[in-house]
Each structure stands twice: as C-alpha cells, then as structure tokens.
A protein has these predicted regions:
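Short glycine-dipeptide loop
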Residues: 347-352
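Glycine-rich S-adenosyl-L-methionine
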Residues: 322-346
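Non-catalytic, mostly N-terminal accessory regions of nucleic-acid modification and defense proteins
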Residues: 1-208, 212-213, 217, 275-286, ...
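Glycine-rich, charged/polar anion/phosphate-binding loops
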Residues: 339-342, 385-389
C-alpha cells in the first residue's frame, strides 16, 4: 500500500468517526451503530453492484437507467454472480439525492432492504443475504419520536456516508470500505468497554492469530472461526495472506444475532463473494453447524472467556466426538476448554489452530487439569504465548494464545 493510500485511509477514518458522532445526536453510539454500519454497507453493495453491471464500460450509467430496462435474464444472471440484485431506483446514490426532501424515506429504505434481501430467495446465496438488514429498524425510537424526526436522522446518516471519499470503486487497491467498517466496529467496541470485546478482536491481536494459524502454509483448504464475532479474525487471514491461499473460503459461527449480521456484512465489504464464505447463526458448543465441512486446515478464534454452558447437564455431550476423547467435559461455569476441544476436533491432520484463551485454564484444577493433561500427553499443543492486556483493549486482564 502506498503512502497516499494510507493517508487516504487515515483521513477517511477520522471523518467517518466524526460523522458517526454527529448523526447519533444524544443516542448512545453503541445503540446507534447499526444505522451507521448498515448505511455504509448499503452504499458499498450499491457501488459494488453498479461496478459489476457497468463492467468498466464508461458509456453505461446504471444509476441513470430506468428499472424497466432490467430483463429477467439480466436479473437472474446478476443474482447468480453477485448473490443479490439492486434496481437503479434502489441504489444508495439515488436515495441519497432526495434524502432530506423525501417524506417516505424510512418506509422507502425498509422496502429497498426487503427487496435486496428478497432478491436472493431460492438462489444459492439466500443464506448469506437473508436478514442482513434485520437490525436496521427504520421505525426505531432511537432515530426519533415522530416520522419527521426519524427521516431527518436517517437523511443525516445517509448524507454523512455519501460525503465519504472512497475514490473510484474500481481503483480501490486497499479495502477502504472494509477498513472503514472495521475501524467503526473497533471504535464502537472500545467506547462500549467490555460488551464490545465480545464481538471484536483488536487488529494487532487478530494479525498475530492469523499469522500463527497460516504461517508456512502454501495453501489451506478453508479457514474457520467457531466464535467468529464480526468476522475480524477471519478477515485478517485474507489481509495477511494472498486470498488464493485459502481455497474453499471462510467459515464462521456466531451466537449473537446482531453480530452475526455484522460478520456477513463484513465479508461482503471485504470483497469476499457469497460463494466464498459461510457464516452460521447458533451455539457452536451445542449445535455446531460445520460438522460436514470439517476438517479445516486453519482455525482462528477468540471465544468468549469463561462463559457458562450446559456441560454435564446434557448427558449426550460426553459422548460427543468433540469432547469424548478427553474423557471429561469443561466445567459448566467455564466453557473455555469446550471451545478448544471443539476446534481440535475440526482440524485436519496438518491443520493448525490459534486460539485466544483466558489464563485460568492453565492452572485451575479439576476437569480443566484433566483436559490439559490430555492435550499435552497427545502432543496437541505447539506453543503458548502470553499477551498483555494492553493488546486486548476491551478486556483488562492478561490473555494467552
């Protein structure tokens, strides 16, 4: 990346945070984040889709076309390629034009988001698109009490995002949209304190984890994060290594619905096509989604620290392929080792997992001691790295990799 690119990115990020703070008014940033992030995503997919339709032909201006010229064939082909469809009238640029004067802005936006999601119905991309805008509630009181107030706030967000200079879409050598999105997420997380850390791993730590998991590999079949949050760890693998290194794409599971949507948006924003990623919603420990996709050559994860799980209250779990080999389940009040054993069972013979863990699992007795012994006796542990809390801003304790 040249210095101009870095300067452009830094300027963009300071502008975007300023706008994010201006448009939220008195609403807490954490509660308002889905509107800013969702609008940024809406602009991105609009420009990405326009770029695809125009195909580099300067004589085509998709935003100026009439919706009537779109044939069934064009639409079908576009959805198979991009995963979704956006009519010219639905593009971000066209909604932004009349944002402040449109009395139906909130209902128009809701209808457009429904239409974009609905365009993927019965197509292979349906799972990746469905519900993407679910958290963008245009009727929310966080936007204001009356329709007029809501529309004014929505228009301010749209115009703010419109004012950001991402340069020419085709010429973007760095993931400016993706970087802006991740920058916003990290700032929201830092300002929210502990709650933010549950869905975002700081960039310096995620870089290290990606490097540990992929170092020395000439290719990996696919990469997986069993507690993927907003997808930042998976995406570091793409940033640190040539995307071609990861042959079959990116897989992740996330338990929180809002965060699951952020992760899917994050994949698109980093130019990962719908057929190259699969993010699932659900509890990895109880209902793992990717049993049929294993083994994985690379696993990266920063699972929640010492959370409760059903453990021994579910008698079937001790016979689960993931936990049976250790002969004991992780304690009900500390699921840390359950995530580690889950990752281990999903690794290929040549695979490597890099996982951020709470230090307690290295010295507590009982079941955790037995699991430690199992891991060490079978030579599954390559190394343990201590990371100071300053590298994990949202958590004021030490961590180990």
């Amino acid at each position: 990346i040249n210095m101009t690119g870095i300067k452009q990115r830094d300027e963009l990020q300071s502008t975007i945070w300023k706008i994010a703070n201006e448009v939220r008014g008195a609403v807490d940033g954490w509660d308002f984040k889905q509107f800013v992030l969702g609008t940024l995503f809406y602009r991105f997919i609009s420009e990405n889709f326009t770029s695809y339709i125009e195909g580099g032909d300067d004589s085509i201006h998709y935003a100026d076309m009439s919706d009537d010229v779109i044939t069934t064939e064009i639409k079908d082909d576009a959805i198979k390629t991009k995963g979704y469809f956006i009519y010219p009238s639905q593009l971000f640029v066209n909604i932004a034009k009349s944002a402040y004067t449109n009395p139906n802005l909130n209902t128009d936006l809701a209808a457009i988001f429904d239409a974009i999601e609905g365009s993927a119905n019965r197509y292979p991309s349906e799972h990746d698109i469905k519900g993407l805008f679910a958290d963008f509630d245009t009727t929310s009181n966080r936007l204001g009490n009356t329709v007029e107030e809501k529309n004014k706030r929505l228009a301010a967000v749209i115009k703010g995002v419109e004012s950001l200079d991402f340069g020419n879409f085709e010429d973007n050598e760095i993931d400016l949209f993706g970087d802006a999105y991740e920058f916003l997420i990290s700032n929201y997380a830092a300002n929210a304190g502990k709650s933010g850390g549950e869905f975002f791993t700081p960039q310096n730590v995620s870089k290290l984890i990606a490097q540990l998991a992929l170092s020395g590999q000439t290719s990996v079949n696919k990469i997986y994060d069993p507690a993927c949050g907003s997808g930042s760890l998976l995406l570091q693998a793409k940033k640190q290594f040539d995307a071609h290194l990861i042959e079959e794409g990116f897989f992740g599971q996330e338990i929180n619905h809002t965060t699951y949507n952020l992760a899917r948006m994050n994949m698109f924003l980093h130019n990962i096509n719908y057929d190259k990623f699969d993010i699932a919603l659900g509890d990895t420990l109880i209902k793992p989604h990717y049993g049929d996709e294993k083994p994985f050559d690379a696993i990266v994860s920063n699972p929640p620290y010492s959370v409760n799980w059903v453990g021994s209250d579910d008698p079937t779990l001790i016979n689960d392929d993931r936990f049976a080999p250790a002969g004991v389940l992780a304690p009900k009040s500390k699921a840390d080792f359950a995530f580690v054993l889950h990752a281990l069972s999903y690794l290929s013979a040549r695979g490597r997992a890099a996982i951020v863990c709470f230090p307690g699992i290295f010295y507590r007795g009982g079941a955790e001691q037995k699991i430690r012994k199992y891991l060490v006796d079978n030579n599954f542990i390559e190394t343990v790295i201590s990371v100071s809390y300053t590298h994990l801003r949202a958590h004021e304790t030490r961590r180990h990799l």
